[in-house]
């Protein structure tokens, strides 16, 4: 399967957008694997006093397992990435990173409550929230909520999340490149990424919690559309996001059938 996506996030710090190309393979009904590469387009707000940047991010690979059960559905994935992005632009931590994620859910008619928990050495981006920074340091991440099936192609997700780091943390800004001074004045609401390119500190530096809302629409089998909102409580940051995804294998496979 070949998949192309374009995602963006906008808040008071500016806009972060990602064009991602990926390829995946399903070995059977339970196991799959994939690789991909993102390209970032970052446009900081005028308050940071910095210019827009762009470039390739970290190449990543994922292995995934999924098991459906009448009692409880479970999926797990392990993603690793190499430091191919430019850390001076905030496109990489300069280190190899991993993320182990686990998800449990159960269908109750139109409601599908879920719990998502994982461990990583870098805060993972989500479809709701492309953070204006990347991080390096061990952490656990949690999300719980429910998917609501509004129709056969429209769904709403409501959830809360928590980022729980431990030990030394390094925060690398995507809106203040290396060599730039960033926002003048002191750090507000813990947003060190507005003032300097790189900050190292304790777990409180990257600790975060908040709420998400996401509306997903799939008008065609090969087309996925998303519109999301995130409120970061720790950083007092409101973000609006969008996503457009195209399953190229499904799209071109359908076109071949039409030609025949």
Protein language model features and the residues they cover:
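Transmembrane beta-strands of outer-membrane beta-barrel pores
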Residues: 1-7, 37-43, 67, 80-86, ...
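Residues on the lipid-exposed face of transmembrane beta-strands in outer-membrane beta-barrel proteins
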Residues: 21-25, 35, 61-65, 78, ...
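Surface-exposed loop and membrane-interface regions of Gram-negative outer-membrane beta-barrel proteins
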Residues: 33-64, 168
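Outer membrane beta-barrel transmembrane domains
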Residues: 136, 141, 145-260
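Extracellular loop and loop/strand-boundary signature of outer-membrane beta-barrel proteins
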Residues: 6-9, 45-51, 85-90, 127-133, ...
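Residues that define the transmembrane beta-barrel architecture of outer-membrane proteins
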Residues: 13-19, 53-59, 92-98, 134-142, ...
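Short glycine/proline- and aromatic-enriched beta-strand/turn motifs that initiate or cap beta-hairpins
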Residues: 1-25
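Strand-connecting loop/turn motifs
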Residues: 26-30, 69-73, 108-112, 149-153, ...
């Amino acid at each position: 399967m070949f998949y192309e996506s374009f995602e963006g996030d906008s808040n008071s710090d500016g806009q972060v957008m990602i064009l991602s190309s990926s390829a995946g393979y399903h070995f059977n009904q339970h196991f799959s694997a994939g690789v991909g590469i993102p390209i970032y387009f970052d446009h900081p707000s005028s308050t940071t006093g910095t210019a827009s940047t762009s470039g390739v991010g970290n190449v990543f690979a994922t292995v995934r397992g999924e098991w459906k059960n009448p009692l409880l559905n479970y999926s797990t994935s392990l993603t690793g990435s190499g430091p191919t992005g430019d850390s001076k632009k905030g496109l990489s931590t300069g280190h190899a990173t991993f993320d182990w994620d686990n998800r449990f859910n159960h269908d109750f008619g139109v409601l599908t409550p879920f719990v998502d928990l994982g461990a990583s050495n870098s805060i993972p981006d989500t479809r709701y929230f492309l953070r204006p920074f990347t991080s390096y340091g061990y952490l656990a991440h949690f999300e719980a909520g429910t998917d609501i099936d509004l129709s056969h192609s429209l769904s709403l997700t409501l959830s809360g999340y928590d980022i729980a780091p431990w030990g030394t943390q390094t925060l690398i800004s995507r809106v203040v490149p290396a060599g730039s001074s960033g926002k003048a004045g002191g750090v507000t609401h813990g947003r060190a990424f507005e003032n300097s390119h790189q900050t190292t500190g304790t777990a409180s530096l990257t600790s975060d919690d908040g709420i998400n809302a996401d509306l997903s629409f799939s008008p065609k089998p090969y087309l996925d559309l998303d519109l999301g909102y995130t409120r970061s409580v720790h950083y007092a940051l409101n973000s609006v996001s969008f996503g457009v995804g195209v399953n190229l294998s499904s799209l071109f496979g359908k076109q071949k059938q039409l030609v025949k």
